[in-house]
Amino acid sequence: MASLIVGGGESLRGSLWIQGSKNAALPMIAAAVLNRGITKIYHCPAISDVDNMLEIMKSLGCCIERTGEYVLIDSSQMDVRDISPEYAASMRSSVFLMGALLGRFGEVSLPYPGGCVIGKRPIDMHLAAFERMNIRVQVTGDRIFCSTDHMAGSGHRLRYPSVGATENIILASVLAPGQTVIKNAAKEPEVIELCLLLNKMGADIHGMGTGNITIYGVSTLHDAVFSLVSDRIVAATYLAAAAATAGDVEVRGVWAHDLKTVLQVLAEMGCGIIVRNKRVRVIGPYMLSCVDSIYTHPFPGFPTDMQSQIMACLSRARGISRLTETVFEDRFKTAGELKKMGADILIENHTAVIRGVECLKGTCVKAWDLRGTAALVIAGLMAEGDTVISDSIYIRRGYEDICADLKKLGARIEERKTG
């Protein structure tokens, strides 16, 4: 186990290059199953979720080469279709391998996937889509079995623009005969990145980013080299930290378009925003202003993965803010920890009503999930005294080295091993 010790009272200043995207890397690693050869991914983040995904790939028979610059995956000799409970139970992104293994072998077996405890994240849309592609789905206990003798392209209208369901359908269908159409598809930048990689391998995918994606099945894919986009949530987290500490931080290597709704909220909170090429700079005011209403939504709406961090910022903003979670029903656990620091937050159904306070006090708090840990770090940076965040190991799932990054900006933060 590990704890983070965060010292408050420092304004963050400086610039950072942002790591590769976690949410783009994981489905891309799964996509390497499909080409029966070599996939080389540059700018792949050194985080525990990627580590675990690569371990799953090794267990399936892939050869992995990893350097500080790239990850190389050779799937030419893989022959296993059964995903071990050891990895799948703790990592939800293992679900992407369902579509990839079905696309390559026509069968897959895995336990229900895990991940952060932030509410129900059912995969019924994934399984229903597979059944429309002539795939047999059987759920026995806590294990899922899928198989097909002849996968076929088909039409899908998602009741919700799920990123995972969209990506799984894409992975399963690129080698399926015929045409597959996904209506109400997810528009996230990470979905676009997956499609760009697959097209570079020889897939025939159109419409990514529009909400209506069409995939024309091809017979084979080939080797590819790809460079990952930077992580928009990591970038937004550091910009939020700048806002919270009356700081001045520039993040580099990111597209402002991917951060549009976050930047709009930060501007409403009184921040100065400067965009130049692939650089975004946020200058925080002496006192943040409240935001009357924020709703989380799928892209291009405000990202649920930034809800906790913005809640932390608003805990010291002048006035009353309302933050409504529409994506996950149980993502307010961090509010209870912020209240231990003196925050005034009331949860009403799916809305957090945040009354800004004059100051937060450093104390001992507990991390519950990845983004909640980042939120507690931001709160610690704002607080008087030191904040100790226990169970902070979650942060390694999405941030390469948050301590080193924040220290570059002038923060006082360190990790301490416990137990």
Residue ranges and their predicted role:
Residues M1-G419:
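Short, structured segments at the rim of ligand-binding sites
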